[in-house]
Amino acid sequence: MKLTKMDQRILNQIQHNSRISNQDLAQKIGLSASPCLRRVRQLEQEGYIDSYIARLNEQKLKLKLIALIQISMDRHTPERFENFEGIVKHYEEVLECFLITGQNADYLLKVIVPDMEYYQDFLLGKLTRIEGVTGVQSSFIMRKVIDKTALPLAHL
């Protein structure tokens, strides 16, 4: 499926407000309600719309410490990577995990926890106990400068 300009407008509206009603969406993009709903359903079926989620307030939930953690592994084998990834994907504190290159690390994790004491327990009780982890370097977020979830669509 090739995305049309109308599809791009739909995606742009939905990624900024996933709770928008079909009627409001249709009005904003200049389409009647039925064709708008058909297009949204098609975008969902084609996988362009992955999910609809609520973005929770970290501060209200007392999640005040965000860490970017570089992880070094002892061996660069598919089995070692599969083991690590299989374990960290179950840690609710891990928001994102990237296999990286160009650094002295193999993985970059984005982790959110309530405080430094919790972070220490997470680091020593979970991360460093994973087989193959040989190094951990943490950086802590002082302030979010840009915090958005909307993907750029202008290139389409």
Annotate the PLM regions.
Residues 1-156:
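A compositional/biophysical signature of low hydrophobicity enriched in polar/charged and small residues
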